[in-house]
Amino acid sequence: MTESRTVYVRVKPTEEFAEDFVKIGEDGQSVTIKSLTKPKRSFLKHQISSYSFQFASILQNTDQQSMFNLTTKPAIDNAIGGVSSCILCNGGPGSGKTHTLNGPQNNYAERGLIPRTIGYIFQRLATQPELGITVRCSFIEFLNEQLFDVLNAFNGQPPKELKIVEAKNGRISVKNLFMPIIKDEQSGLERLFMGNALRALNPIHLQTTSLFTLWFDSDIPQPTTEKPLHTKLHFVDMASPVKFETSNRESEEFHRQASINRTMTVLERVLIATEHIPYRSCPLTHFLKDSLCNRCIIAHVSFDSESL
């Protein structure tokens, strides 16, 4: 399978769309944003009056099923076919990242990418039992350059320090990470919902980067690769970049904000690097090392007048 690097933009619905400043191209792949600031000095010339960006697609008023078909279904097929993949959602606070990934728990029609993925996987595997694929899940938070096991509360064991391990073949795993087997859609959804519920108990945790991963393993040689299967599919809910709201460099808030911004900077460097790629510069990129070659980034934006 070929490497895939795709970027989509999902626009949050609004009744106050800033049409005077934002123009989405008729092709549905480009957007032009006018500069909102006026030059302070009238004698300056050649100032940039607008910025244009190109994407695989700009998604407006797109339903959850269409989002899944376009952005996630190919990644699932890759993972089951032998290539680890990554779905990465980023955007500002309230831009809709978590809605895209999870959706409301009590509205089946609006369920997000992860619940739809779990359902699709077991529908597909039910038709191919000869593949002998076992599915596991894990749920990790990244806070202040450290990894935390969200699902460990259901492990019945005291928490242990998580350590990212890289095998000689380049495969990434996490030592001491709780990775329960999920045998069907219901058990997978239970793990996801329990993890989300635990995170919601502490508001600070909702401001961290979280990573829900599905692991696929089989000792049976697979038809696409003629090798045993050991892949993963990551869903990353990126913490939003933040402005420093405190000057106290010793405070926990300062360190948390600095960690979020540093992770975003390292991730950007990894995504644009062509030669030496600094995967080990932060835990998130190190963990995603064997999956970022096949990635789908969903950038969430709000083009309402108030946000601009």
Please give the residue ranges for each predicted region:
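Conserved lysine of the Walker
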Residues: 97
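Short catalytic micro-motifs in class I SAM-dependent methyltransferases
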Residues: 299
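Long, amphipathic alpha-helical segments that form or neighbor coiled-coils/leucine zippers used
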Residues: 306-308
